[in-house]
Amino acid sequence: MNIDYSEKIPNNVNLSNDRRLQRALERWQPEYLNWWNDLGPDKGKELEVYLRTAISVEKEGWAHFDFVRMPEYRWGIFLAPAEENRKIGFGQHLGEDAWQEVPGEYRGELRRLIVTQGDTEPASVEQQRLLGHTCPSLYDLRNLFQVNVEEGRHLWAMVYLLHAYFGRDGREEAEEMLERHSGDPDKPRILQAFNEKTPDWLSFFMFTYFTDRDGKFQLASLAESGFDPLSRTCRFMLTEEAHHMFVGETGVGRVVQRTCDLMKEHDTDDVRPFGGIDLKTLQKYLNFHFSVSCDLFGQELSTNAANYYNMGIKGRYNESKIQDDHQLYDSAYSVMECKDDKISMAEVPELNSVNERLRDDYIDDSELG
């Protein structure tokens, strides 16, 4: 399933067969490029960067590497291959055919999920736009730019869904994604974690370790969706997301290793005089980024999350591998609660604790690294 790069907007969704949609996206494209030039990587316009570009959505040979100036990067619309006779795997529609169009009764909920996910993609680019001025190495600079262009492509993925399936409302939502800005007092990003500053490279490494890992779990749960175009979009986004977490894992690992080496060499935990980052600072950064990333999963008990699950539009992480009835009408889940100034575990309806289960899975994955 190769990608057509001869078109103005590279894609594998036969965009040329839908002239109305093609024209709408081509009108949005210059607005996106203006946003990139204004709020993308600062002073990165003329740099030739060795970037990965998707040329296929198949597992083998899906990417091409070459030098490219970032404003000339070919952002496009790529969906994973369709699964023949795919069925909805959870909720009240369990076993029914996956939807190729938006069910009218779930239109508002699906749009809200897509907008919330889509809003995070340009937000992180805005947060990281000045990091190129202080990069530890060219290797790190290249990784930063790779993450940035792929976050931009993930925005394109969500904007395609809004334009293709939500009509005028979707087009307006796509425009508003470029009007909101990270940390803007008047028009901030939807989720608070994406309004925080990323002023230095330790923040960036922690962000790609923890916050991009949240992205992995959110995308994986959306990839279970009964709305097939959303599922296919998120499945391919997960392929690109893996590199973002690699940047975080190896970045944090290098910092910690350097700290340990200096502690051993100088027999002290005060490594700042020797150019290291001390353990107290590492712990402070870890606490902050882990906390704001955990907040992204929402409340422990959530009616919205229960409704999304019951509707079949957002599942659990690795839904098909979970051994239960995939409807959760009578099952329970343990969550922490604060009662009488004490924290204890309580059994609650599992359908209402879908957020907490996803957060628990995220925490387990974060501990593994």
Predicted regions and their residues:
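Alpha-helical scaffold segments that form or flank carboxylate-/histidine-based iron centers
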Residues: 67, 107-117, 136-154, 229-242
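Alpha-helical transition-metal enzyme core signature, strongest for iron centers
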Residues: 117-125, 147-162, 179-187, 208-215, ...
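Active-site-proximal structural scaffolding
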Residues: 212-215, 234, 286, 359
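Inter-helical turn/loop segments and adjacent helix faces that build the functional surface
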Residues: 130-142, 165-166, 217-237, 251-280, ...
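Terminal targeting/low-complexity segments that flank the catalytic cores of oxidoreductases
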Residues: 1-135, 139, 165-202, 286-369
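Helix-rich catalytic cores of soluble enzyme domains
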Residues: 137-140, 146-176, 190-193, 202-224
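C-terminal edge and immediately downstream basic/flexible tail or linker adjoining helix-turn-helix-like DNA-binding
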Residues: 275-287, 291
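Short, surface-exposed, polar/charged, turn-prone segments marking secondary-structure boundaries
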Residues: 155, 252, 260-261, 323-325
